[in-house]
Regions:
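Bacterial N-terminal signal peptides
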Residues: 7-16
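Positively charged n-region of N-terminal signal peptides that target proteins for export
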Residues: 1-4
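Low-complexity, acidic/polar, glycine-enriched regions of mature
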Residues: 20-166
Length: 166
């Protein structure tokens, strides 16, 4: 898996939000990290790997019941494989945490900060944000579906930006 992965898929689900429809002012809504999950998918020429990674913290900013901002902090030391078991999983996880990939020892957190949020129909939002991983920040766009007690997003990150200057 030498610098072949070109995308990282983060499916952020189940935020367990309070009833936001009744909000009439700006409210910072903390994400319930124990009820949230991030699923990653890394693709390479010869296949793919997938797993989970823990959310350390997160906040959604709501204004008059609409999403206007937010941020998430991810624990890079928690990256785990779900498609491999035993020694194979440990080897992949060790590689991903190493300096060669995410350098979790020196960069233990990744962060996504919303820079623009555009409301669509039916609780759908087009979000633009800055994603910082391994000390490098690049823009990303994604759709976020926000319902009564759940928010779901699929974020695709091209990891080439991490390795261009590495």
């Amino acid at each position: 898996m030498k610098k072949i992965i070109t995308t990282l898929l983060l499916a952020i689900t189940t935020f367990c939000l309070p009833d936001l429809s009744a909000q009439k002012t700006t409210v910072m809504v903390p994400i319930n990290v124990s009820e949230s999950s991030i699923h990653w998918l890394g693709k390479k020429i010869t296949g793919q790997h997938e797993g989970n990674i823990n959310l350390l913290s997160g906040t959604l900013i709501m204004e008059n019941g609409l999403l206007t901002g937010g941020d998430f902090v991810v624990d890079m030391n928690s990256i785990a494989s779900t498609d491999l078991k035993g020694e194979s999983a440990k080897k992949l996880e060790g590689s991903l945490k190493s300096e060669e990939w995410f350098d979790a020892e020196n960069h233990p957190q990744a962060k996504l900060v919303f820079t623009s949020v555009v409301s669509q129909d039916g609780g759908l939002y087009n979000v633009t944000g800055d994603f910082t991983i391994k000390g490098k920040t690049n823009p990303t766009n994604f759709e976020l579906q926000l319902n009564y007690l759940e928010a779901t997003a699929k974020v695709i990150i091209d990891l080439l930006f991490i390795f261009i200057t590495s």
